[in-house]
C-alpha cells in the first residue's frame, strides 16, 4: 500500500481547503485568535475527517474558539467539500493540537535555562 493513499491525499486537500475557508473568516463571534489547521486525518472510507487545529490565544479564548469551530463544522465541511468537489461530504470533527503550545513551552524553558547559564546561576 502506498504512503500516498487516497484518504491521506484527500485529508491533505481537505486541510488546505479548511484553512482557506477559516482564513476568509467566520461570522461566529467566538472564533477569534490566530487559527492554524496543523493536520487532518481522513477515515479509510472517506466518511469522517478529523482536523487538528492550533489556536494562538489565552485558554478561555481558545476554548471559545474551539466551541465556535465545532458549531460551524457543518458549514465548514460543506464549503470545503464544495471546493474539492467531493461526491460525499465527510463529517468534520475538530481536535485541539497541543503540539505547537508544547513546543513553545519547551522553547521558553530552554531559553530560560540558557539565560541562567549565561549569568552563572545553577
Curated annotation (Swiss-Prot):
Record-linked InterPro entries: KH_dom-like_a/b, RbfA, RbfA_dom_sf, Ribosome-bd_factorA_CS
GO molecular function: ribosomal small subunit binding
Location in or out of the cell: Cytoplasm
Signal peptide: none
GO CC annotation: cytosol
Keywords: Cytoplasm, Ribosome biogenesis
A biological process from GO: maturation of SSU-rRNA
Family according to the record: Belongs to the RbfA family.
Subunit structure: Monomer. Binds 30S ribosomal subunits, but not 50S ribosomal subunits or 70S ribosomes.
Role summary: One of several proteins that assist in the late maturation steps of the functional core of the 30S ribosomal subunit. Associates with free 30S ribosomal subunits (but not with 30S subunits that are part of 70S ribosomes or polysomes). Required for efficient processing of 16S rRNA. May interact with the 5'-terminal helix region of 16S rRNA.
HAMAP family to which the protein is assigned, alphabetical: RbfA (MF_00003)
PANTHER family: RIBOSOME-BINDING FACTOR A, CHLOROPLASTIC-RELATED
Protein name: Ribosome-binding factor A
Organism: Anaeromyxobacter sp. (strain Fw109-5)
Gene encoding the protein: rbfA
Amino acid at each position: 500500500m502506498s504512503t500516498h493513499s487516497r484518504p491521506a491525499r484527500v485529508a491533505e486537500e481537505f486541510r488546505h481547503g479548511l484553512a482557506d475557508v477559516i482564513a476568509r473568516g467566520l461570522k461566529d463571534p467566538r472564533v477569534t485568535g490566530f487559527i492554524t489547521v496543523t493536520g487532518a486525518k481522513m477515515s479509510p472510507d472517506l466518511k469522517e475527517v478529523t482536523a487538528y487545529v492550533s489556536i494562538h490565544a489565552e485558554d478561555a479564548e481558545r476554548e471559545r474558539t474551539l466551541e465556535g469551530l465545532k458549531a460551524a463544522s457543518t458549514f465548514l465541511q460543506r464549503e470545503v467539500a464544495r471546493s474539492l468537489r467531493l461526491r460525499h461530504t465527510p463529517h468534520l470533527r475538530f481536535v485541539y493540537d497541543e503540539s505547537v503550545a508544547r513546543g513553545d513551552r519547551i522553547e521558553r524553558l530552554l531559553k530560560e535555562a540558557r539565560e541562567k547559564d549565561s549569568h552563572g546561576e545553577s
